[in-house]
Amino acid sequence: EPYRRQRQMCIRDRYINSIKNVKILPYIYNMEEMMNISDLLVCRSGAMTITEISIVGKPAIFIPLPSMSANRQEDNALVLKKIGAAKIILNKDVTGQKLSEEIDDIILDSLELEEMGKIANTIAPSNVEEKIYQEIKEVVK
């Protein structure tokens, strides 16, 4: 926990004065709201996170959770990386410097930032609400 807090403070100090409206948070309870107002997401890459990011159309830097079984999060992150909507930093390679460089590469290039978000949105599942509604209707019958 102290290491995590120290990293958070280091990142905050680097960006707090150079980029407007930066928020560095240890945990987010209102994820949907934060995703919608964010320009760039730095996060793990679980299947739901990938889906949510594609729906809101945001660029991302993924730090996949290392796994003993098949590196699922890394595979998930590769889906968006391969189409140009995300970057990946493996957990074993994460440093403040590396993360800072990746953030700078994206956030300081407004065209890349916008393009990555648009690309992410191209793989968003469509008609999700309708599909859920139809499934519920089938179950209730």
Go through each PLM region and give its residues.
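Conserved donor-binding/catalytic loop of nucleotide-activated donor transferases
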Residues: 36-38, 54-63
